[in-house]
Design a protein with these regions (language model features):
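Walker A/P-loop NTP-binding active-site region of P-loop NTPases
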Residues: 1-47, 84
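Conserved beta-strand segments of the P-loop GTPase G domain that flank and frequently precede/overlap
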Residues: 2-4, 33, 71-75, 96-100, ...
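Switch II (G3) loop of P-loop NTPases
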Residues: 33, 48-84
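Conserved nucleotide-binding/hydrolysis micro-motifs of P-loop NTPases
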Residues: 37-39, 77-79, 101-104, 129-134
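Flexible beta-alpha connector loops of hexameric P-loop NTPases
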Residues: 44-54, 97-103
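Inter-motif core of Ras-like GTPase G domains
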Residues: 66, 80-101
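Hydrophobic micro-sites
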Residues: 106-158
Length: 158
């Protein structure tokens, strides 16, 4: 499962870590792979120019999948690193972390379009750092309700 975001500081690594923790608490065998090779501890995945060593990554991923129930790949932001798209092609599924008021709708749409171009592999988005006031109307009971649907980055109420 590839976990990515549109921009930095959207909580991508925190979501990946918490997902790995939750799965391991269910007694699943989980490997959390830091594939953000711009950071020092993952630099062995990149060549001198800073590009992903695809063959090494693919072999690593194959081996990890054989030994674990889940492999969670924490990647650089999707639109800021071309190698993330290549990693998404190798992953079985992807999850996009979106922090409230961070990415512009056009950037979110671009990232989702690229992820969705890989087939049915994109599981959806994690809406992170949401303000409680935004969620409160959706948590109440009664006759008043709203449907939120449409193109990414917009919603329509009915």
């Amino acid at each position: 499962l590839l976990v990515t975001s549109v921009l930095e500081k959207e909580g991508r690594s925190t979501v990946a870590e918490n997902l790995a923790l939750a799965l391991s608490m269910r007694k699943e065998k989980v490997f959390l792979l830091n594939a953000d090779f711009r950071k020092q501890n993952a630099s062995w995945l990149a060549d001198e120019e800073g590009h992903l060593k695809i063959e090494i990554f693919q072999k690593l991923l194959e081996n990890l999948k054989k030994e674990n129930d889940y492999v969670i790949i924490d990647t650089p932001p999707f639109l800021q690193n071309a190698d993330t798209e290549e990693m998404a092609q190798m992953a079985d599924a992807s999850l996009l972390v979106v922090a409230e008021h961070r990415a512009q709708a056009k950037d979110l749409n671009a990232a989702l379009d690229l992820l969705n171009a890989q087939g049915e592999k994109n599981l959806g988005c994690v809406y992170n750092n949401a303000h409680v006031e935004f969620l409160r109307p959706m948590a109440s009971y009664g006759y008043q309700y709203a449907y939120h649907y449409g193109r990414y980055g917009g919603h329509y109420e009915r």
